[in-house]
Amino acid sequence: VNEAIRTAYEQKGVAVVICPNDLLTEKIKDTTNKPVDTSRPTVVSPKYKDIKKAVKLINKSKKPVMLIGVGAKHAKDELREFIEMAKIPVIHSLPAKTILPDDHPYSIGNLGKIGTKTSYQTMQEADLLIMVGTNYPYVDYLPKKNIKAIQIDTNPKNIGHRFNINVGIVGDSKIALHQLTENIKHVAERPFLNKTLERKAVWDKWMEQDKNNNSKPLRPERLMASINKFIKDDAVISADVGTATVWSTRYLNLGVNNKFIISSWLGTMGCGLPGAIASKIAYPNRQAIAIAGDGAFQMVM
């Protein structure tokens, strides 16, 4: 169990302990070595030569797009400064929903089967992809054509794992984005961004029409709009698997101080309510909200 816990922390994911059915009924002597607290440097500084290579690609690009993941969650300020300097639209992976506020003008939503049309169109028309803190697994939604790409990640194994990368930056995203901002050219106007924001405005209009649909029976989109009115700025949202994921992702407008918890690609149905309970234990002074369908709710009751 101790090894599983260490592995989960080191790999930033789920560790599973599998036991034979009859083992848990047996009595054994406790011969397990006591765990030793260990520490290792958590901040990896990128190589400056890689930063310079990335700067050249960014300055040359006419149609850049950025895809961010949870590896950028501690670099919110640096991310915002970079994209506003370079005028780059940002797409987020589903677990990274609150890294950039949903109402930031350059945020165009998430990518994938339940992503926005704007994100997919922008991704396919881009001439440069910048991936930050993500090992995005759904490669069918990445650019179909062979474009230039930059990837920032603390784990060198993730560099080029999903997409052909021209410049890999192994390092902390907070440091890397700050260094990129200090070295890139300031962009006053980017036609590609303007075109993207025009598409985003159309998408947002569609979403508003859904949320204002007063037909009966009550539409889930309208329910999400009502819930959104009562969500506090630092609330924790625990979204379950299924259509509840679609509703909460598309129709909840969240900010950088919110937490958005999902099962992601694990698809663990029934995670919504336990996630909200755990959130209230971890953050007793914060609002915790579970978004779950009837099936997911019944699975844990």
What is each stretch, according to the model?
Residues 1-33, 57, 120-148, 179, ...:
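Structural signature of the thiamine diphosphate
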Residues 73-77, 133, 137-141, 246, ...:
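Short glycine/serine/threonine-rich phosphate/pyrophosphate-binding segments
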Residues 62-75, 83:
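Glycine-rich phosphate/diphosphate-binding loops and the adjacent beta-loop-alpha structural elements
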